[in-house]
Amino acid sequence: MTGPGLRLLAGMGLAGALVLGLSLWLHFDPDQHLPIGSIQITGEPRHADTDAILERVRAHAPGFVGTDLEVLREELQAMPWVDAVQLRRRWPDTLEVHVTEPVPVAQWGDDHLVDRHGRLFGPVDLAEWDFLPALAGEDGRQVVLMHRYLEVSARLADAGFEVVGVHEGKRHDWTIHLADGAEVLMGRDVNLNRLGQLVRAAPALRAREDAPIARVDLRYPHGLAVAWAEEADNDGGNAR
């Protein structure tokens, strides 16, 4: 082949090479293949161990050449007090690690917290978090207890009772803890209609000013029993 045909073939070959080169360039991220010289932690974490985060990042891949950032991100998010991590490469050689801490919404047991997703994290000193509602039960039941807390809090607020905690025993019996120190025993059935009995009885219960309520037992089908502070030590109570 000579003349115009040869020139056309050569032109087509050159065009193909240019297209292939452009495609490779578009799919090639040079930053992923450059060594990282520095690490910057952002997000102003207050509780997460930034030294441990730095150590984990540095140990992940020597020189950080070709580091799989997704794998590293998952490892960092599994660390205590880390809810989410974003990794960004900053020109020319910086890896930015943006840390978002979990938002605690409740205490759990003796030394853990529950975040807004229902996940447990800790151990922590709960004295710093005593303003949060206290939940207790078997691990894995925290979402159920969170929902129960919201339900009973809303129902008892109608009578001026403040719920500060909910406990589920090993036999799935429920106890509600009030801000004044009183306990409300629910048994295995958290029936909001039974809570209505307490709401309706609240004015009469508050009319007695000589002793605070220690315990309210709602495990009766059609009534409740009240133990006052001086009677609680003897496990007594007045049925209504």
Swiss-Prot record:
InterPro entries: Cell_div_FtsQ/DivIB_C, FtsQ, FtsQ_C_sf, POTRA, POTRA_FtsQ_type. It comes from Thioalkalivibrio sp. (strain K90mix). GO terms for cellular component: cell division site; plasma membrane. It holds the Pfam family FtsQ_DivIB_C. Essential cell division protein. May link together the upstream cell division proteins, which are predominantly cytoplasmic, with the downstream cell division proteins, which are predominantly periplasmic. May control correct divisome assembly. PROSITE patterns: POTRA. Keywords: Cell cycle, Cell division, Cell inner membrane, Cell membrane, Membrane, Transmembrane, Transmembrane helix. It comes from the Bacteria. The chain crosses the membrane at residues 8-28. Its main location: membrane. It is found in: Cell inner membrane. Residues 1-7 are cytoplasmic. Residues 29-240 are periplasmic. It is a single-pass type II membrane protein. This is Cell division protein FtsQ. HAMAP family: FtsQ_subfam. Disulfide bonds: none annotated. Residues 34-102 form the POTRA domain. Signal peptide: none annotated. Belongs to the FtsQ/DivIB family. FtsQ subfamily. GO terms for biological process: cell septum assembly; FtsZ-dependent cytokinesis.
